[in-house]
Design a protein with these regions (language model features):
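A short acidic, helix-capping loop that chelates divalent metal ions and anchors anionic groups
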Residues: 3-7, 91-96, 170-173
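A short, glycine/Asx- and small/polar-enriched loop/turn
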Residues: 8-12, 43-44, 79
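Conserved residues at beta->alpha junctions
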Residues: 18, 132, 167
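Mid-to-C-terminal secondary-structure elements
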Residues: 22-37, 47-155
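Membrane-helix entry/capping segments
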Residues: 150-175
Length: 175
């Protein structure tokens, strides 16, 4: 969700990502301060957020901002989120991250906390990430995930679901 926020450091475009408590694992994030939001935060739709150390410094001039509130305006609605965690990207040697002037700041919030912004579509997902132990066969896991989704949504054989592996993404980037 795209929005805006204003702090003592200025006006910022904001990207609000709707996530579960498993986001640090999926996104390869390390906590620098505080905690990530919990399963209870997600279940109860608590207005909490996690931001990166880089964005904290852009927004507030420091990454020591645990417990502070940040107001975000999306779709003509302003909502306040309590900052519970500050992340830092783990070094993996594969990807390079750039920050540029005007780049949106990113707030990760429990997907259930975004109901005010997106209405009752907050529990409708357009994508998901599945991770497994590297010893497991990704083809088998992929087929089981599709089979489970088709069974639960009575859509067997309708090709509603698309698989995209890391290799598929890398191939698109290199083509």
């Amino acid at each position: 969700i795209m929005g805006e926020t204003v702090t003592g450091k200025g006006d910022f475009s904001a990207t609000v990502t709707l996530e579960t408590q498993d986001a640090p694992i999926v996104n390869n994030l390390a906590l620098k301060r505080g905690t990530y939001f919990t399963e209870a935060d997600v279940a109860e739709g608590r207005n909490v957020c996690v931001i990166s150390d880089t964005d904290a410094k852009r927004l507030f001039g420091s990454d020591d901002v645990i417990g502070m509130d940040i107001d975000v305006q999306c779709y003509d609605l302003t909502k306040s989120f309590r900052i519970v965690g500050i992340t830092t990207q783990k070094e993996n040697g594969t990807f390079v991250s750039y920050t540029y002037e005007g780049m949106p700041v990113t707030l990760s919030v429990p997907y259930t906390a975004a109901v005010d912004f997106v209405g009752d579509t907050a529990d409708e997902f357009t994508s998901m990430v599945v991770q497994a132990d590297k010893k497991m066969d990704s083809q088998v896991i992929s087929k089981e995930v599709i089979k489970t989704l088709e069974k639960r949504h009575q859509s067997a054989g309708e090709d509603y679901y698309q698989l995209q592996s890391f290799q598929d993404v890398m191939k698109m980037m290199n083509d």
